[in-house]
Amino acid sequence: MTDYTFPVIIGVIFGMTARLYMLRTDYRQYPTYIHGQVIHIALGFIASGLGAIIMPALIQEEFTAITFLTLAATQFRDVRNMERNTLTQMDSYELVSRGSTYIEGIAIAFESRNYIAILTALITTTACIFFSLVVGTVVGILCFFMAKLLMSGSQLKDIVNIQKGELRFDGAGLYVNDIYIMNIGLPEKQKLILEHGMGFILTPKNFNSATTIANLGQRQAILFDLSNVLGVYRDSGEPSLCPLAKRDLNNGTLGVFILPQWQREDLAVRVLEEVPILENAIRMPTDFIKKKVR
């Protein structure tokens, strides 16, 4: 064994630990089956191994070994494409789809998590080499918590206030409070909607929030998460029984209409609160306005 054996092993362990933690699945994530997880565990091991050998390779002046990082970057970009293509194909068979914005966010997350595994292994191994195995272990633990912090993005409750809305019909028009949702002409469908439907009002906390929830991809993510947890009272070929989110053009308030199988208002509010804010949906118009005012 060389002087770098234990530092590399510790780096790989912490890189893999970080990747395994970031692989945890819930109701909105993919992969949810063991075969999909095996692919990402294997790629996480490769990423951790690459990160762990970077510093020993530099010290030994084995600069050729560093070129493998370019191959790794190409491979991890393929992971992003694989996730995007897989989820896009799966999405066409969902009763309530994720939407392309949500899918792109998941694909980006899976690519970036491999890079986090590389950085975790690199930093841990470097600390082990230049200080000690104990210091390297402490640094690895800190990197693990940093990875945990990077996973915790903004949630819907951070940008809106959520309250229950009243479903009502004005003629053939379906409303959540005063926000128009869609036109339902058949009396039997109106009865089904009033019986099984639920409505919520999302009031943005500021102008940036109003612009963010106006994004169609963010709205679709809200509907998908609600339908995924609470179920959906519809089948294919039922356009009138389709969950929708519509906007009040005057103040940016969002009216959300869903048809859950499980009539749990408290659970629906909790799901709404934890809907992730999609990176591609975030808008900061006030930052531009402030710069112009100056």
Mark where each language-model region is.
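Membrane-anchoring hydrophobic segments
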Residues: 1-61
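Alpha-helical transmembrane segments and their membrane-interface exit regions
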Residues: 16-21, 69-81, 140-151
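Select subsegments of transmembrane alpha-helices in polytopic membrane proteins
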Residues: 38-43, 105-118
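Alpha-helical transmembrane segments and their membrane-interface junctions
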Residues: 62, 66, 117-137
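A cytosolic-side transmembrane-helix exit/cap motif
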Residues: 82-95, 153-165
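Short membrane-interface loop/juxtamembrane segments of multi-pass integral membrane proteins
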Residues: 91-109
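Long, charge-rich C-terminal accessory regions
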Residues: 138-270, 278-282, 288-294
